[in-house]
Amino acid sequence: MDKLIIKGGKKLIGEVSVSGSKNAALPIFVSTILAPGLNEIRNVPFLRDINTTIKVLESLGAVVEGNGNIVRIDTTHVNNVEATYDLVKTMRASVLVLGPLLARHGRARVSLPGGCAIGARPINLHLKGLAALGADIRLEHGYVEAKAKKLKGARINFDISTVGGTEQLMMAAALAKGETVLENAAREPEIIDLAEILIKMGAKIDGAGTDTIRITGVKELAPVAHDVMPDRIEAGTFMVAAAITGGDIKIRNMKLEHLDALVFKLQDAGVEITNRDNVVRVKGPRRPKAVNIKTRPYPGFPTDMQAQFMALMCVADGASVISENIFENRFMHVSELLRFGADITVEGSTATVKGVKKLSGAPVMATDLRASASLILAGLAADNTTEISRIYHLDRGYESIEKKLAGLGADIQRVKE
């Protein structure tokens, strides 16, 4: 197993380029099931979750070839409708194959998913929505079994904003008979990216990016080529890396408008952010100011940036209050940040962070994907050496992050334990 060794205290200086978005790429890959033939997906990041998705698609009958950041997916012979536990258990997004398989073949058998250990993340909203489209849904022996001769459009109001649920039903409804209206739909940029490839394929979708999405079903979809959007969470992580080290970096291949809530909070903390010719410059202060945050569905502050922002607040001047309103059990990084000398107290879904002048390097252990990033950030800012173990979480969502940080002057290396 690999671990990261970081010798902290260096300001990050230079330029870095953001990879394609994992959270956009996964549903885009799955959407190719709906369009039999050869689809080409570009700007694909090299990540463990991408490889898992490829294995799921191959198990269903797809032929997948990769060349650099371009992946070609031939879904002509996707005739198997079962995604087994061995494949699905490692990644929650695998459950997204349910809707497309149901829409294309009229049946699907998909194992209940695994993935990050962040609360329950129930898929009941997916299943409730598919049932509203006319599917017969049963849970048997850890599998979701779904059947429908032909899905039919319906009006579906989500109890809570759900990114996966919105993606699932947008794909399923693309081939349903009649109009489907998704109310209280998720508004994330990744939803828009998925809608864009579906529209290229021939789907009729209006309102992606708003809380009401209308999908008029069509008889068939055709294969296409598509570029995955930049990863806004990776971009945000680099922004915080510049801020926490007092650095000065330029970030390419990012869309700043996807991170408005984070940008406002970083600016409140004293970080200078400018956008010129689609290159974002981030200049960290001598010491950040304490700022309160509350995670919200997009366009609010992203839950996937909460852990990284907490690391920044650990060295801020003053006390900050961080409220996690999206996922339960998403403060697992706190116990590890305390090992750096951070001053954090947790009560329910709220953490109070009293900034200290300096963190001290320590041996720590990653617990999930974004927690891994927060520990790297703390290590970059800390005195002495930090060792981070269990970094396999990191490889699920960040493409060569240690190489990119080293390119900005960080003293960071991956070694075998």
Swiss-Prot record:
Pathway in which the depicted protein is active: Cell wall biogenesis; peptidoglycan biosynthesis
GO terms of molecular function: UDP-N-acetylglucosamine 1-carboxyvinyltransferase activity
InterPro entries linked to this entry: Enolpyruvate_Tfrase_dom, Enolpyruvate_Tfrase_sf, MurA_subfamily, RNA3'P_cycl/enolpyr_Trfase_a/b, UDP_GlcNAc_COvinyl_MurA
Name of the gene this protein is made from: murA
GO cellular component: cytoplasm
GO biological process: cell division; cell wall organization; peptidoglycan biosynthetic process; regulation of cell shape; UDP-N-acetylgalactosamine biosynthetic process
Record-annotated active site: 116
Binding site for phosphoenolpyruvate: 22-23
Class of enzymatic activity (EC top level): transferase
Reaction catalysed by this enzyme: phosphoenolpyruvate + UDP-N-acetyl-alpha-D-glucosamine = UDP-N-acetyl-3-O-(1-carboxyvinyl)-alpha-D-glucosamine + phosphate
Record-stated family: Belongs to the EPSP synthase family. MurA subfamily.
Binding-site residues for UDP-N-acetyl-alpha-D-glucosamine, renumbered to this chain: 92, 304, 326
Modified residues (2-(S-cysteinyl)pyruvic acid O-phosphothioketal): 116
EC code: 2.5.1.7
Compartment annotation: Cytoplasm
Keywords, comma-separated and alphabetical: Cell cycle, Cell division, Cell shape, Cell wall biogenesis/degradation, Cytoplasm, Peptidoglycan synthesis, Pyruvate, Transferase
Protein name, per record: UDP-N-acetylglucosamine 1-carboxyvinyltransferase
Role, per record: Cell wall formation. Adds enolpyruvyl to UDP-N-acetylglucosamine.
Source organism, top-level taxon: Bacteria
